């Protein structure tokens, strides 16, 4: 949103992101090295093993200063066959989605004059704690009435221990942008290794959809990391191994005989969300709000593709305009 609507980042702001990016890289390699022994994998060489010992000795926090020796250790490890094998099994342990991107680009990133690109910033990740507000104005298309619409967006922490804070911003919300990583269908939660990430997201969507404070809010669901999902399927991962009901879903009447597993996986995930919005649930006796007429849009997106997000924002305009017209009694 910042890139699209608030003039992006200054060079100073880009440089402020460098420690975050270095931490992402270090955390990724630290996790890979930690899980080599757990998965019973071997390093390609003694040199790689020594590099791994060095990374482990630093702990899970990146060093304050990235020197040449550190960079050599990271590059040696990323070129090691054993580490690559570990990466291929990363669905078995928590690992940042941006791991491959940053390690593939590490030589560029480790340059002393490095300034993060927009794509680097989009790939970086910092766990959100608390609630953060961003305010911006967007021109409303003439077809939707023209003028300028001010948006106040709240970024809330998604971890389980952060969710009790959400209620602070629920009242008066017109639209909920709910992000689900469809590429996480084969992974478990960091907080609970027994729980599938996608199933957790579906459960959370149900609780937010049914929240009485959001009864009049429209929903836009970003089914994000579509590219990650498609890459995993090409590599031989199958959602049916984690959601057995996918098999029955695929046995429903199909158009033609061609079966595209990526396409059907997307349909399956979206249908699970649609089913949730159609569920009946017990309402508080004091709550007379009609939940049945809310809008819910679904978009499969790639987080680093701003054109995807731009298209989605047309839905936000449409949704808020529709709500404003209803409030004026014209609908």
Give the ranges of each region predicted by the language model.
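Active-site neighborhood of phospho(di)ester-bond hydrolases with catalytic His/Asp-centered motifs
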Residues: 222
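Hydrophobic "lid"/C-terminal helical patch
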Residues: 316
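Conserved beta-strand scaffold positions in the cores of enzyme catalytic domains, especially
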Residues: 297-300
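Switch- and interface-adjacent substructures of P-loop NTPase systems
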Residues: 2-217, 225-294, 304-309, 319-323, ...
């Amino acid at each position: 949103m910042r890139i699209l609507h608030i003039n992006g980042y200054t060079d100073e702001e880009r440089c402020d992101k460098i420690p975050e990016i270095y931490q992402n890289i270090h955390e990724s390699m630290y996790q890979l090295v930690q899980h080599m022994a757990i998965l019973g994998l071997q390093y390609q060489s003694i040199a790689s093993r020594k590099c791994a010992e060095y990374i482990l000795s630093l702990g899970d926090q990146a060093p304050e200063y990235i020197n040449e020796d550190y960079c050599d250790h990271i590059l040696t490890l990323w070129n090691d066959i054993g580490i690559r094998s570990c990466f291929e099994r990363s669905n078995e342990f928590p690992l940042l989605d941006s791991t491959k991107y940053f390690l593939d680009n590490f030589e560029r990133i480790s340059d002393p004059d490095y300034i993060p690109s927009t794509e680097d910033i989009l790939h970086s990740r910092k766990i959100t704690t608390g609630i953060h507000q961003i305010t911006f104005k967007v021109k409303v298309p003439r077809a939707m009435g023209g003028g300028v619409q001010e948006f106040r967006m709240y970024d809330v922490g998604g971890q389980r221990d952060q969710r009790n804070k959400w209620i602070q911003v629920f009242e008066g919300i017109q639209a909920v942008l709910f992000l689900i990583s469809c590429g996480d269908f084969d992974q478990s939660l960091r907080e609970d290794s027994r729980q599938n990430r996608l199933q957790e997201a579906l459960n959370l969507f149900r609780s937010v959809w049914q929240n009485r404070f959001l009864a009049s809010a429209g929903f836009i669901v970003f089914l994000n990391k579509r590219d990650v999902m498609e890459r995993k399927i090409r590599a031989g991962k199958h959602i049916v191994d984690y959601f057995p009901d996918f098999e029955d879903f695929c046995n429903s009447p199909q158009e033609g005989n061609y079966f595209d597993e990526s396409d059907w996986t997307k349909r399956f995930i979206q249908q699970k969300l649609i089913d949730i919005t159609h569920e009946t649930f017990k309402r508080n006796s004091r709550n007379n709000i009609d939940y049945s007429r809310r809008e819910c849009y679904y978009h499969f997106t790639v987080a680093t593709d701003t054109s995807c997000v731009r298209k989605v924002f047309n839905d936000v305009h449409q949704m808020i305009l529709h709500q404003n017209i209803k409030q004026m009694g014209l609908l």
